[in-house]
Amino acid sequence: GDGTVNEVLNGLMQAQKEGKRAALGVICAGRGNDFAAGPGIPEDIPGGCQALKADQRQWIDIGKVTGGVYPDGRYFVNNVGVGFDAIGTIEVAKLPQWGMLSFMIAIIKTIFLYYKGPVIKIDYDDQTLTSDTLMFLTMNGRRMGNGFQMAPESRLDDGLFDLVLARQVSRLRIFSLIPHFMKGTQGTQPEISTWRAARLSITAVKGTLPAQSDGEILCVDGTRLEIEILPRQIEVVCAAKKD
């Protein structure tokens, strides 16, 4: 799953510091398997084995996040999320592996458990934005939650994160936004802003930051995160070469 991919990624980066390099290969057997959608890795086990055998590779960007329980930094490959999705991550971990159903149950629970998000300040590429927020995503990959198209135009090798800000809305409005996130059309909605950046920091102005990275909890009451992209840092074994 994505959490295991994250752990292996951090091991590969430690090996790089010691002068050793290896490619990242993935056989999908987790709850979400969202990273795999980016480089075209098959989400079934036989397909994943065939991809490893074919050994076609792609250089991809990764991210590094500093803060929370990782004051010295932690590498990630798919995303960092602040707010609603981090609470959802905690809730989905309590459930059996039921695929999309697990994530939908967790979302519904989170809508009622976690309603008022923090006010955050986002500093990115010499610009600053302060906003109330339901959820703020730093996406390297495209997908989260076993199929939600959070950043449908994201590329793993463009040297940029796709940023998604969902402002605070009513509970009823959250329900109506869910289909847009499933289809990747959330950018058409007035409460959603999307843009790109290579480096950013997130600071809690009011409230605290619950945050996750690749489905693993970074903090539940953090105050600041710093995030940067590392272009084309590792090789991934993928199903087919990407243009």
Role assignments for model-derived ranges:
Residues 2:
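Polar, low-complexity loop segments and adjacent catalytic/binding residues used for recognizing
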Residues 5-6, 220:
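Short, well-ordered alpha-helical microsegments
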Residues 10-134, 138:
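Catalytic core of DAGKc-family lipid kinases
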Residues 81, 85, 137-151, 217:
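Glycine-rich phosphate/pyrophosphate-binding beta-alpha loops
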Residues 85-88, 130-132, 144-147, 171-174:
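Short acidic/glycine-rich loop or secondary-structure boundary segments that cap or lie
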Residues 96-105, 147, 152-173:
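Gly/Ser/Thr-rich active-site loops/lids in small-molecule metabolic enzymes
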Residues 116-118, 132-134, 157-162, 196-198:
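A generic structural signal for short beta-strands and their flanking turns/coil linkers
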Residues 124-125, 130, 155, 165-243:
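ATP/nucleoside-binding phosphotransfer catalytic cores, i.e., glycine-rich phosphate-binding loops
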